[in-house]
Amino acid sequence: AELEAALAATVDDAPDCDWLDHSECLFPFPSSRFEADDPDTETGRRLAFPAGAMPVNLQGEAVDPEPFARSDGWGVGTPIMVTIAGVDPEASGFPSEADPATSVDDGSGTVIVDLTTGDRVAHWTEVDARPEIDEADRTTVLLHPLTMLEPGHRYAVGVGQPVDQAGEPIPVSDGFRVIRDRLETGIDAVEQRRERLDEVVAAVAAAGIERAEQWLAWDFTVMSEQN
């Protein structure tokens, strides 16, 4: 009940944001949280950003979400990003730029799965520690696929239990925990996404990170060539 109450408060405080990652509104990125079903597109999806989720420019004006709605998915080169507070990437088993081949081994701390084909996608990770926002709780991890993503395909991204610089496990978000641990909630925003996210968790488990070991998993659809 305590977990559900905390998650409900998170959803209520930022209804336009993704409750899977409490630190950044649009994270993890890119995500099906900001897609909608659309039977008239090639992918069956289109981008759908609530106005309240859009970043604000230097003039204090929110970016207009409307132009994005013309896309039936995300660009093939869209950066894949997630916030992992104070993570030690090496100790967490994240594949490095020097050795990206480990990203398709079962011991990899991150996985990208092409849900259209079932194939794992080789990639490397980069920790973005910019000094101007060098706060431990704002550590951004980027996943860089070695090849361009396939137009029209749906992808899953998974992160195994990461550890911080002291070797301590970094706590999982309330939002992902209720999905991973199959904890039913009375929160509509959560339950509406449960079925889709369950598919993602299962795909990540099949790709080598067991359900109980998952720290975060999400999905997104790449735009079609016809878009």
What is each residue range found by the language model?
Residues E2-N227:
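Acidic, low-complexity Ser/Thr/Gly/Pro-rich repeat segments typical of extracellular/periplasmic
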